[in-house]
């Protein structure tokens, strides 16, 4: 019986020590920074949610501070426009239809602008009028040094007057975002049409030059001496050529027999077009 009270007393002491150790884990002394929280301690769900909210607030404060510093460093007002309305429509279309492959960084790299410009374009819902589009595009093209022949806008009194044929606006400025997929096909079709027109022009020029050359050759043929253009019967008889321009039978016999009269002909005959000459350059006959 005397042993049992000691056992009970020892059990109570152990329980008190255990309770005091558990309490030291949860209760911290004010002003004491030496004790660190136990990483193995299982926090309550409410405490975890509180920590998540605190971390989110810290991140939000950092972002707000960064935006303030950035606005102070940058120039006031909207940044200068560097994209045409056609390019902005293409950016919106690519991001809307192919958002996975065309992310904001890739769009910024493809259009050679910063990611902030891409975000401003995607965030903007402003729909300008045709006059505003033309004015802004003209400014952008002048700034980048690629000013094209954009038609001048009519005055305030001529707003209801349609543009003439020479002042028709380029179709690339009027295509909406839903039709941006057909721009590449239309551009290639236009290039093919230009190539076909160039080829047809070249072919026409070649045919004209060829006709001029043939006409010049015909004029050269007609421009011959009278004796050669209209040979007399005496010349025909001497050369053995009949009225058709072909050698006579007698002349052929003389050529075959080698009796060429006073002229010495070679057995080798050279053909030049429709005329035949010997190796010495003497005219034989014409076909």
Curated annotation (Swiss-Prot):
Signal peptide residue numbers: 1-23
Compartment annotation: Nucleus; Secreted; Mitochondrion membrane
Principal subcellular localisation of the protein: nucleus
Molecular functions per Gene Ontology: rRNA binding
GO biological process, any: cell differentiation
Record-level GO cellular component terms: extracellular region; mitochondrial membrane; nucleus
Keyword tags: Developmental protein, Differentiation, Glycoprotein, Membrane, Mitochondrion, Nucleus, Secreted, Signal
Region (Disordered): 149-169
Pfam families, per the entry: Neugrin (PF06413)
Annotated glycosylation sites: 202
Keyword field contains Coiled coil: no
Quaternary structure note: Forms a regulatory protein-RNA complex, consisting of RCC1L, NGRN, RPUSD3, RPUSD4, TRUB2, FASTKD2 and 16S mt-rRNA. Interacts with 16S mt-rRNA; this interaction is direct.
Role played: Plays an essential role in mitochondrial ribosome biogenesis. As a component of a functional protein-RNA module, consisting of RCC1L, NGRN, RPUSD3, RPUSD4, TRUB2, FASTKD2 and 16S mitochondrial ribosomal RNA (16S mt-rRNA), controls 16S mt-rRNA abundance and is required for intra-mitochondrial translation of core subunits of the oxidative phosphorylation system.
Protein name from the UniProt record: Neugrin
Species this chain originates from: Bos taurus (Bovine)
Gene that encodes the chain: NGRN
């Amino acid at each position: 019986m005397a042993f049992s009270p000691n056992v009970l007393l020892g059990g109570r002491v152990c329980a008190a020590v255990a309770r005091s150790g558990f309490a030291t884990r949860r209760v911290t002394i004010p002003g004491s920074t030496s004790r660190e929280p136990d990483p193995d301690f299982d926090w309550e769900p409410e405490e975890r949610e509180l920590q998540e909210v605190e971390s989110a607030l810290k991140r939000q404060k950092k972002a707000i501070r960064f935006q303030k510093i950035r606005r102070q460093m940058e120039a006031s007002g909207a940044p200068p426009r560097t994209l045409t309305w056609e390019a902005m429509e293409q950016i919106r279309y690519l991001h809307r239809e192919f958002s996975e492959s065309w992310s904001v960084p890739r769009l910024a790299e493809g259009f050679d602008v910063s990611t902030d410009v891409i975000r401003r374009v995607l965030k903007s819902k402003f729909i300008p009028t045709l006059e505003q589009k033309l004015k802004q595009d003209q400014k952008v093209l002048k700034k980048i040094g690629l000013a094209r022949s954009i038609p001048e806008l009519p005055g305030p009194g001529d707003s209801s007057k349609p543009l003439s044929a020479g002042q028709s606006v380029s179709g690339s400025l009027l295509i909406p975002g839903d039709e941006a997929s057909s721009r590449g096909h239309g551009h290639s079709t236009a290039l093919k049409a230009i190539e076909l027109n160039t080829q047809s022009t070249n072919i026409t020029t070649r045919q004209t030059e060829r006709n001029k050359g043939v006409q010049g050759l015909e004029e050269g043929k007609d421009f011959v001496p009278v004796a050669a253009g209209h040979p007399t019967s005496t010349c025909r008889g001497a050369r053995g050529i009949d009225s058709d321009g072909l050698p006579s039978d007698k002349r052929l016999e003389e050529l075959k027999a080698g009796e060429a009269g006073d002229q010495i002909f070679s057995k080798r005959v050279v053909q030049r077009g429709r005329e035949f000459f010997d190796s010495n350059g003497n005219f034989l006959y014409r076909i």
